[in-house]
Amino acid sequence: MKRNLLLLLMVFATLSFPLFANGTDEKNVDAANPYKGKDLVVATWGWSAGNLKKLSEDFEKKYGCNIVIDETSGNSDRLNKLIAQKNNPEIDVAILSDNFASIGIEKGLFDKIDKSVVTSYDDLYDFAKNADGYGPCYSLVRYGILYNADAVSAPTSYMDLFNGNYDGLISLPDMASTAGPYLLVSLAEDLGGSQENVTPAMELLKKEKSKIADFYMSGSSVQTGFTTGEIAVAVFMDMNVPLLRKSGLDIKWVTPKEGSFSAAATANVVKGCQNPKLAQLFIQYLISENVQNKVADVLSEAPCNSKATMSEEKAKYLASGEDAFKALKVFDLDYINSNKATWIEQFQKEIAN
């Protein structure tokens, strides 16, 4: 009897061992992957949400987490949301154009990059690195002139838009948008002014505002304007060329003689966020060579990692390589941001209304 009982206990112990072992292994797996089941909230433009989610699929698989997209549309709306949530942020990673990101940095909204985690940082082009150690640029689009070759002839400069050939068919960025202040300074320089003296440009826009069909805040209004024929020329982003061509329009890109200017997308870790380490890992993922090789195809934006490549087809309309980046018009973002509110107020009073 005792012998049978002993054998039974030995069998039970043998059968039970794998169960306990498996439980221990599962615990170890969870400990090794503390991000499993976590939601990483990434705030970006609504129009880019699907593409960013697609670009993030491998990150979700690697860490067992879920990328939740906060589709707060415009840069200004996203920045205001971050400011409102400063003491209790719901967002982990903030995607903003570089000029809006600089405002966020000034307001203390972001953590600095941990280069022991963001190990691809040194592979970025210099322009993509933040001098103070905050979030880098991971992609870039250019603003220049897009025109419908079936409707109008090619302009060569921003000033050409007011020569009478495009009356009523022009779309320009609103002053509260990313590109509005850049265009204002460019026009001021054409007219003998500067960023410190934008009066000539304000006077030009006030005089010629009847020729302008739309001052846009979102890219969707420009896309709609082209497809409906309400506009035929716009100061707009290069990334929209293939999309508009797919709609059957003969859209062409012009680099104005004043130069095209960039809007670089930055990724920052929100200070006090729920998942700071995972947010750092996500930024590393975004700027890694492997993911940067996909940026042009998935986002229709230029990658910022110097080791990244893109197809010849994409390089026809996206900035490609160091020479192309160096050719972009550069602005003093600190000066523009400190004067932007005044410019917006004047623009709304004298031009937009």
PLM feature segments, named:
Residues 144-151, 186-190, 263-275, 286, ...:
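A bilobed periplasmic-binding-protein/Venus flytrap-type ligand-binding module shared by bacterial periplasmic
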Residues 45-53, 90-230:
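Extracytoplasmic ligand-binding site segments that recognize negatively charged/polar headgroups
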